[in-house]
């Protein structure tokens, strides 16, 4: 699928999502699969949690619009889901919701040779992120943080 058609598909799906007070968190099209797999992760615009029913209610109109658009001339699988474990934390709501959960923090390595830190999400302020690493609180300035993701305790 070329970039132009992917962009058209994304706009089409955003319109469907907006009608249901949803937004597209991410869109991934796996053209190396047969049939093509279209993975869509949705979020509610009001910040509430996405339910299984929300995913199901988005699926039918999204599929209908894809069919009407004729952007795909092949068979495809449409997968609708909500944001889940191992996703990046970005919003204030994410940080409040997942306080105490295990996180991976990817660092930019400007001031440190350490690339990743793992711990429990403790606190987020405007200037720093605090994580609990084996009972000790480590404050990391945000200018040193590249990415914060949920993980499992094994990670």
Curated annotation (Swiss-Prot):
Record-linked InterPro entries: Ribosome_maturation_RimP (IPR003728), RimP_C_sf (IPR036847), RimP_N (IPR028989), RimP_N_sf (IPR035956)
NCBIfam families: PRK14646.1
GO biological process, one term: ribosomal small subunit assembly
A Pfam family per the record: RimP_N
Gene3D superfamilies xref list: RimP-like superfamily, N-terminal
UniProt family annotation: Belongs to the RimP family.
Free-text function comment from the UniProt entry: Required for maturation of 30S ribosomal subunits.
Main location: cytoplasm
Subcellular location: Cytoplasm
Record's GO cellular component terms: cytosol
Keywords of this entry: Cytoplasm, Ribosome biogenesis
Full protein name: Ribosome maturation factor RimP
